[in-house]
Regions:
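N-terminal glycine-/serine-/threonine-rich beta1-alpha1-beta2 phosphate-ribose binding loop
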Residues: 1-97
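Conserved active-site and cofactor/substrate-binding residues in soluble primary-metabolism enzymes
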Residues: 10, 14, 18, 71, ...
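Active-site-lining helix/loop region of Rossmann-like oxidoreductase modules
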Residues: 10, 152-278, 295, 302, ...
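ADP-ribose/adenylate-binding Rossmann-like module
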Residues: 82, 94-115
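General beta-strand structural signal in soluble alpha/beta enzymes
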Residues: 103-104, 133-136, 162-163, 221
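Rossmann-fold NAD(P)-binding glycine/threonine-rich loop
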Residues: 106-131
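Alpha-helical support elements that line or immediately flank enzyme active sites
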Residues: 142-154
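C-terminal helical cap and adjacent loop that interface with cofactors, partners, or active-site loops
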Residues: 271-331
């Protein structure tokens, strides 16, 4: 094994490309290959595809096996899909190839609430391979779970946790603006909601992680998603939104224990939503309130995924979460 950690970037969408760029600039990490099924990317130089401005002498491969036929690797940084039914086979493939995994798949961050059988399959595959899998990101992975859990370290008692995240999506990347429903009619928004493909992915995972880590049994989980409508015509670099159309969403999740509500998470992401901000309120002994004045989700997701690589390499085999690792830092 070389001194540098050899990384394969699996998925070259906007986040994957940003991760790859960050790997290239980080000391102690080496980008040895990339995978993407997009025929417009396959075969091209990675530096060109990720917008690096220079050649890396690596061609984008269509398959992981094609990468590993040319080089050895230690870790895969996986950035393809949010949903277990779409990414599980990819994760199993990576593990069977003998690589540790850091993934930005939201449903992998704490999957035992909604996907217990699939989580058990991934965990078993990781243990068979002697490798580690982590799902992380800014949210889930930090703002609404790892951060409030870390803050409870200075509490003698925790009665209730409330986290509110507000994102002004006007200057965010196009796929994110699309993800929150920008430019949709209310009817189209509701139809996509009914199909289970609208709304922020990861709130159930965050609620479950907080409950489980603090030793509470999650008796009931409830969530609501509603569109945020434009009161006037809006335009971004990616969308034109008419008055009355959707400019974003508000999603609220509630986790109840035997004594009532214990966790409340509010996620608001909309065009022209005002000041970005993340607020954690803990009721207990003592009461705490911490506000971050705007966490850029794209930058933070890239950072935490890359920063987690060393922790994952040192972790025992299996499917792990952010609460299982030593504190992830910028080194």
């Amino acid at each position: 094994m070389t001194d540098e950690i050899r990384i394969v970037q699996y998925g070259l969408g906007p986040i994957g490309a940003a991760v790859a760029r960050h790997i290239v600039e980080r000391e102690g990490l080496e980008l040895v290959g990339t995978v993407d099924i997009d025929p417009n990317k396959a075969g091209k130089d990675v530096g060109e595809v990720i917008g690096l401005g220079r050649s890396l002498g690596l061609a984008v491969a269509k398959t992981l096996s094609a990468v590993l036929s040319q080089t050895e690797a230690d870790v895969a940084l996986h950035t393809t899909s949010s949903y277990f039914d779409l990414f599980q086979s990819q994760v199993i493939e990576i593990l069977e190839a003998g690589l540790d995994i850091v993934s930005t798949a939201e449903e992998l961050s704490f999957p035992w609430l909604d996907h217990p059988e699939a989580a058990a399959e991934v965990d078993a595959a990781a243990r068979r391979a002697g490798k580690t899998v982590l799902g992380t990101g800014v949210n889930p992975g930090f703002i609404m779970d790892a951060l409030p859990l870390f803050l409870t370290a200075i509490c003698q008692r925790v009665d209730h946790i409330e986290v509110t995240r507000v994102i002004n999506a006007s200057k965010r990347r196009g796929p994110f603006q699309a993800k929150i429903g920008s430019g949709m009619t209310v009817e189209a928004f509701e139809a996509k909601m009914a199909a289970g493909r609208m709304g922020h992915v990861g709130l159930p995972e965050s609620v479950a992680m907080v409950f489980d880590t603090l030793g509470h049994k999650l008796v009931r989980y409830e969530s609501t998603v509603e569109p945020v409508l434009a009161e006037r015509d809006l335009k971004t670099d990616h969308f034109e939104v008419r008055a009355g159309q959707v400019r974003g969403l508000k999603q609220v999740a509630h986790g109840y224990g035997k004594d009532g509500e214990f966790v409340a998470l509010t996620f608001i992401a909309a065009l022209e939503a005002g000041q970005d901000g993340d607020t954690v309120k803990i009721s207990g002994k003592p009461d705490l309130e911490v506000t971050l004045k705007g966490t850029n989700g794209d930058i933070a997701t890239v950072a935490i995924a890359v920063n987690a690589v060393r922790r994952v390499q040192a972790a025992p085999p299996g499917l792990v979460t952010m609460r299982d690792l030593p504190i992830v830092t910028a080194r």
